[in-house]
A protein has these predicted regions:
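Conserved alpha/beta enzyme-core scaffold
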Residues: 1-501
Length: 501
């Protein structure tokens, strides 16, 4: 056995468990429920899933796949297109699998990311036969050291009947010590989660495992798929500037200080642009308590703006990832990776008083937000953690451009055809047109703010015409709607290719 591999397997009785990816994949049977590591391209199982794809070329079988969040795009895509996946959850981010979900070939269980662990404990999806978990090391005292994400790995390792480990020796050993693995007690016996600051460490260095459950160890050197951060354009930069101005106004109102509150930011170019904007802002000594740490977080650490960052995953561009992982020791005292059961836990989010920034597909004139379903029917990626954060944060902020498809679609509509975040969970909406602060407002007070500040000028007249007609038709009801007209813009889109009258 190579010295590098031997040094990563501290439990020497496991040395004879090292097998090929094909041998490990052969252990999985048709109909199995399989848990896999992976959260937004990071720390995902890679080589055994691809061996399953190869196996599917000569053998017909299907499995249910549950993870922390999305796997690397190739893994989800190839598993789906090989016909291996019957059902998938709780989140995905690949066009290939999305197409098969939306034509009915794959079932998809979309859920709040904080809910997964409890559902696995209760075997809601059935007994989990196998876990396939990427690890940087297995320590002599029986801890599995995750790589660049933790996600649902602790609970998957606990409930799975059998475990396959992908020992990825391309990840640096300096990852040891980055993780903080805390698993709550059973419901009904549970104590308060003792986390009162984003930088607190409350758990253990790795995932305690039962060695008897480990059926195979596969050596991997496959890197994580790098993030594809789209550089901010003029409009995303404008949105970022609006948000920074909003935070400044909150300081003037006495609700925040220059350190703000711990920040949660969703994945994507707008969120990254907002974080980048902090570099030249008045804000300082910031903390991040999020799901995913993107490029901008490390740039802010380097700039001395962020003191500490907590998440469940690190997802970086290729260039920055190389620099960070080659110098991980420099960040060790400023980072922690936790299970998503903790990073997304409502109790912790409420206690820390987070500022939550997530992306919407669209919002309606009363402040309801659709994050998941295009035209109400076709799944995009999933709700992810946006619901965990929006409902429980100090500030639940949603960002979106005011239009889509070159201006033929309005992102502000009379009534969203699918609701992920109700009007009660949405504090602020930001588009490139402006900001709507909805806190404390009645439905009819929100309408002028959302239409005037956030809607694209091409659609404002249509939106006002609908609202005024709804007020008249309902006798000025609490939340005026004309149900047989509420989706007129979608009817127009379907018939003409545009929402414009």
């Amino acid at each position: 056995m190579e010295a590098t591999i031997e040094s990563r397997i501290g439990l020497k009785e496991l040395a004879d468990k090292v097998v090929s990816a094909d041998q490990a994949a052969a252990l999985i049977s048709n109909g199995d429920v399989v848990g896999m590591s992976g959260f937004t391209r990071a720390g995902d199982a890679k080589v055994v899933p691809m061996a399953l794809v190869e196996r599917a070329k000569t053998e017909k079988f299907k499995i249910d796949v549950y993870t922390g969040a999305s796997l690397g795009p190739e893994v989800d895509q190839f598993l789906a297109q090989a016909g291996v996946i019957r059902k998938r959850g709780p989140f995905q981010g690949d066009k290939g699998i999305r197409t098969l979900i939306n034509n009915g070939e794959i079932l998809f269980a979309d859920m709040h990311l904080s809910h997964g662990a409890e559902q696995f404990r209760q075997e809601i999806f059935g007994p989990m036969k196998y876990a396939i978990l990427e690890a940087a090391a297995i320590t002599a005292d029986g801890y599995l050291i995750p790589t660049t994400s933790v996600g649902n790995n602790p609970i998957i390792a606990d409930v799975a009947e059998n475990i396959i480990i992908e020992l990825n020796i391309s990840h640096p050993e300096s990852l040891i010590g980055i993780h903080d693995i805390y698993v709550p007690e059973k419901q009904g016996e549970r104590q308060a989660i003792p986390l009162t600051n984003a930088s607190d460490r409350i758990g253990e260095k790795g995932i305690k495992i039962d060695p008897s459950k480990i059926k195979a160890i596969v050596i991997s050197q496959e890197p994580d798929a790098p993030s594809l951060i789209v550089p901010p354009d003029e409009e995303t930069q404008t949105m970022a500037n609006y948000l920074l101005d909003f935070f400044s106004s909150e300081i003037k109102a006495g609700r925040l200080t220059k350190t703000l509150a711990p920040i949660q930011s969703g994945v994507g170019s707008v969120a990254n642009a907002v974080l980048d904007g902090f570099a030249d802002s008045e804000f300082e000594h910031l903390q991040v308590f999020s799901e995913v740490l993107q490029d901008a977080v490390f740039n802010l650490i380097d700039a001395g703006k962020v003191d500490f960052a907590s998440a469940t995953s690190i997802t970086l561009s290729e260039e920055l990832g190389k620099r960070v992982y080659e110098n991980l020791d420099q960040y060790a005292d400023k980072l922690v990776l936790r299970p998503q059961e903790i990073s997304n836990h409502p109790e912790v989010i409420r206690r820390l008083g987070l500022i939550s920034i997530n992306t919407a597909l669209e919002a309606d004139i009363y402040g309801n937000v659709n994050s998941t379903h295009v035209s109400g029917s076709k799944m995009m990626n999933g709700i992810g953690g946006s619901g965990d954060f929006a409902r429980n944060a100090r500030l639940g902020i949603f960002v979106t451009k005011s239009y889509a498809k070159g201006g033929s679609i309005s992102s502000i509509v009379p009534m969203v055809p699918h609701v992920d975040h109700t009007e009660h969970d949405v504090d602020v909406i930001v588009t490139e047109q402006g900001v709507a602060d909805l806190r404390g407002l009645a439905p009819k007070e929100r309408v002028p703010l959302i239409i005037n500040n956030c809607a694209h000028p091409d659609f404002k007249e249509q939106l006002w015409e609908y609202y005024n007609a709804a007020v008249e038709a309902t006798g000025n009801a609490q939340t005026p709607h004309i149900l047989n007209r509420a989706f007129e813009m979608y009817d127009l889109l379907e018939k003409t290719g545009s929402m414009k009258k």
